[in-house]
Amino acid sequence: MSDYQMFEVQVSQVEPLTEQVKRFTLVATDGKPLPAFTGGSHVIVQMSDGDNQYSNAYSLLSSPHDTSCYQIAVRLEENSRGGSRFLHQQVKVGDRLTISTPNNLFALIPSARKHLFIAGGIGITPFLSHMAELQHSDVDWQLHYCSRNPESCAFRDELVQHPQAEKVHLHHSSTGTRLELARLLADIEPGTHVYTCGPEALIEAVRSEAARLDIAADTLHFEQFAIEDKTGDAFTLVLARSGKEFVVPEEMTILQVIENNKAAKVECLCREGVCGTCETAILEGEADHRDQYFSDEERASQQSMLICCSRAKGKRLVLDL
């Protein structure tokens, strides 16, 4: 389980980048440097709007070489659970937010000879800190960034003017420059690691094409904070410590059922399968893992699960709660 510490920061700048994306610059309330981080790190942002509490994970896009501030970018989601809407509509310069210390589930692989970044939409954010981290490195890298059109391409001007702009490739479906994924992956050099962040369709396309080309699974790395589907078949949940039983319906998560029934005390910061704070041991049954936290080996072991997003594979699941 990840060990997060929460602390307050102040919003020093809010910049609209596109119609749907804003960049927020965060500084320490005492003016001191913020905790160090590495490229690909994220923070959990906790927000309060009256009786409503929101908790979202956001990648740090600023340079790991400069901890005078953190920067995050937030896309206003159409079906927002409240967090992105709150940040877009209510947070202003001077406001304070509670965030976690950085954690990294999407770090660069030190042994890689080359890093190939594939981004879709707001999935560009972790790669900005990766690129900054590699600024003084001899390791080669290349970025392919997909968006609908130039107007929806956040950070477009900065990427076009990047000191190593020849490594940056922008793909817009509206202008006929769509990414040719099959060709890109077919031509990768030995020792290349591929990192993908973006919508589920992009991630699945990379997985499928990489499998077709027999690209080693341990050279593929994915990150996707917004879990698009937490629903599934209903099942019986048993809390072993209390002996309580509940039915988890199709449209609810295990965590929601536990909270609604005040059945156990469970800490969860992100509610998106990212932070690991709701990790719970499995005593009986198997989990349908939908998190971004565990490795493939940890998921296969079926020893524990993140109850904010994952479900039961069968009809009955017994947890150590």
From Swiss-Prot:
Top-level taxon: Bacteria
A GO molecular-function descriptor: metal ion binding
Domain 2Fe-2S ferredoxin-type: 233-321
NADP recorded as keyword: yes
Binding locations of [2Fe-2S] cluster: 270, 275, 278, 308
Catalysis: reaction(s): (R)-carnitine + NADH + O2 + H(+) = (3R)-3-hydroxy-4-oxobutanoate + trimethylamine + NAD(+) + H2O; (R)-carnitine + NADPH + O2 + H(+) = (3R)-3-hydroxy-4-oxobutanoate + trimethylamine + NADP(+) + H2O
Alphabetical GO biological process terms: carnitine metabolic process
Family, per entry: Belongs to the PDR/VanB family. CntB subfamily.
EC numbers: 1.14.13.239
Keyword NADP set for record: yes
Functional description taken from the UniProt entry: Converts carnitine to trimethylamine and malic semialdehyde. Can also use gamma-butyrobetaine, choline and betaine as substrates.
Gene3D superfamilies given in the database record: 3.10.20.30, Nucleotide-binding domain of ferredoxin-NADP reductase (FNR) module, Translation factors
Protein source organism: Escherichia coli (strain K12)
Pathway entry: Amine and polyamine metabolism; carnitine metabolism
This protein's UniProt keywords: 2Fe-2S, Flavoprotein, FMN, Iron, Iron-sulfur, Metal-binding, NAD, NADP, Oxidoreductase
Name used for this protein in its record: Carnitine monooxygenase reductase subunit
Quaternary assembly: Composed of an oxygenase subunit (yeaW) and a reductase subunit (yeaX).
Cofactor(s) listed in the protein's UniProt record: FMN; [2Fe-2S] cluster
Domain FAD-binding FR-type, first and last residues per copy: 4-109
Note accompanying the cofactor annotation: Binds 1 2Fe-2S cluster.
